[in-house]
């Protein structure tokens, strides 16, 4: 096998607190927006919730021994803010801190590097009650929480991620309303975008100014956008190109630009102002504040699953006059096209468009309809094929000069898939939610072997 993954390449797997921990109200934990959102009827498929999830809170030792058997070099997980500050601020909950003490110690004992996401969507409900991420005050509440946790674990946790997928936090939570807190207001979503960026900068700045010996980055879900031009004899007009490009800026550059260049994409802001989706004063102050607070992160995390193919459609009811195309090909259970070339294209585009930065693929994986066969096994050959192709795209990107340092498969185990409840399985470990039994899928053994051969 071609040994072109660099020495020390971080092979990992990823999870998130709300999706696996369960124990939603145990040991002093406060209510999060996902607790509230899932307990309200009709928000989640089949009324599923994360009250128990994979019960990782009580079974983390078993889960860490599975990680060790897998041969993971690193494990990416998130801390539940509501376990540390049940109300989001004020009194610290010692039992919450002690849980993460035990988890982190267990990982380190087993030679697995903990990579910690500070915020993976489970905001304390008490903070949502005062506006959540749309309230500028939240920047300070987040800062206090983040610095408390970083200072407690800085000797054992060297890689920190401020936010997981700010795009989803802002637009799925505050515009489309399909994620907690379920708000549907584009202007509010833009306030959220800005709070997230300022919160990110504030933590990175404090870590650097106080010479804390850790690295801080952020994880963005990025989707390369392709213009549908394959229609016979069709000439793409300038307006089409521009609209598809603007839609890509909303998905990608709206976060990449401030994080790596210290400014929002101006063309996009102008368009939103013109469409009355953003106040012109607000657009000015957003640019100004990002410029003043900008600080370059230590690394960039990328979550990649698929691409988007779009074409111009003046009858579209979306923000831009475009619609999605679904090219012929292989799709996962999420209805996402399997397109490994997109990962390569994305990595090369970032390398060519932005200042140099170490990159980690912080999530990549696929949901398939996994079943336990009579022999008690899960034969997930499609997932193996998916991972193989994406690892290959990553390897090719490294050969082309991309500074890729690690790769985290989503996910270590099947878990609560947000609005889809438990209907979509992403794990390389199967979870029987009735019994909490863990079953290693074929992809577990494939990844175990792949790590061995590429370390």
From Swiss-Prot:
It is an enzyme of class 3 (hydrolase). The active site is at residues 165, 363. SUPFAM superfamilies: (Trans)glycosidases (SSF51445). GO terms for molecular function: beta-glucosidase activity. Keywords: Carbohydrate metabolism, Cellulose degradation, Glycosidase, Hydrolase, Polysaccharide degradation. GO terms for cellular component: cytosol. InterPro entries: Glyco_hydro_1 (IPR001360), Glyco_hydro_1_AS (IPR018120), Glyco_hydro_1_beta-glucosidase (IPR017736), Glyco_hydro_1_N_CS (IPR033132), Glycoside_hydrolase_SF (IPR017853). GO terms for biological process: cellulose catabolic process. Transmembrane segments: none annotated. Its EC number is 3.2.1.21. It catalyses: Hydrolysis of terminal, non-reducing beta-D-glucosyl residues with release of beta-D-glucose. Belongs to the glycosyl hydrolase 1 family. C.saccharolyticum is an extreme thermophile and appears to be a Gram-positive anaerobic bacterium. This is Beta-glucosidase A. It comes from Caldicellulosiruptor saccharolyticus.
């Amino acid at each position: 096998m071609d040994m072109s993954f660099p020495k020390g390449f971080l092979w990992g797997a990823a999870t998130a607190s709300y999706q696996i921990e369960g124990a939603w109200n145990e040991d002093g934990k406060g209510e999060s927006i996902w607790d509230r959102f899932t307990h309200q009827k009709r928000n989640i498929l089949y009324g599923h919730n994360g009250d128990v999830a994979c019960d990782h809170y009580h079974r983390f030792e078993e889960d860490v021994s599975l990680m060790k058997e897998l041969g993971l070099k690193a494990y990416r997980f998130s801390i539940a803010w509501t376990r540390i500050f049940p109300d989001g601020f004020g009194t610290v909950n010692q039992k919450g801190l002690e849980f993460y003490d035990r988890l982190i110690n267990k990982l380190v004992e087993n030679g697995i590097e903990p990579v910690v996401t500070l915020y993976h969507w489970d905001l304390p409900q008490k903070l949502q009650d005062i506006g959540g991420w749309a309230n500028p005050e939240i920047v300070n509440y987040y800062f206090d929480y983040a610095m408390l946790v970083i200072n407690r674990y800085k000797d054992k946790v060297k890689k920190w991620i401020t936010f997981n997928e700010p795009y989803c936090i802002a637009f799925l939570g505050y515009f489309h309303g399909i994620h907690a807190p379920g708000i549907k207001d584009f202007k509010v979503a833009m306030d959220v975008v800005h709070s997230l960026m300022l919160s990110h900068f504030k933590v990175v700045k404090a870590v650097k100014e106080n010479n804390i010996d850790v690295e801080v980055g952020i994880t963005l879900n990025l989707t390369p956008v392709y213009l549908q031009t394959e229609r016979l004899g069709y000439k793409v007009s300038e307006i089409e190109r521009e609209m598809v490009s603007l839609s890509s800026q909303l998905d990608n550059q709206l976060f990449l630009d401030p994080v790596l260049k210290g400014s929002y994409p101006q063309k996009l802001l102008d368009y939103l102002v013109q469409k009355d989706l953003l106040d012109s004063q607000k657009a000015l102050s957003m640019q100004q504040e990002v410029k003043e607070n900008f600080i370059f992160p230590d690394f960039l995390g990328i979550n990649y699953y698929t691409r988007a193919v779009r074409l111009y459609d003046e009858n579209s009811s979306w923000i831009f006059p475009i619609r999605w195309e679904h090219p012929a090909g292989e799709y996962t259970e999420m209805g996402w096209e399997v397109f490994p070339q997109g990962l390569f294209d994305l990595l090369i585009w970032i390398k060519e468009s932005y200042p140099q930065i170490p990159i980690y693929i912080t999530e990549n994986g696929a949901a398939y309809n996994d079943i336990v066969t009579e022999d008690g096994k899960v034969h997930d050959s499609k997932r193996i094929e998916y991972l193989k192709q994406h690892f290959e795209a990553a390897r090719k990107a490294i050969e082309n000069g991309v500074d890729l340092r690690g790769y985290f498969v989503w996910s270590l185990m099947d878990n609560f898939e947000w609005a889809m409840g438990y209907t979509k399985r992403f794990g390389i470990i199967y979870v029987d939610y009735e019994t909490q039994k863990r079953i290693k899928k074929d992809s577990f053994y494939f990844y175990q072997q792949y790590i061995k051969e590429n370390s």
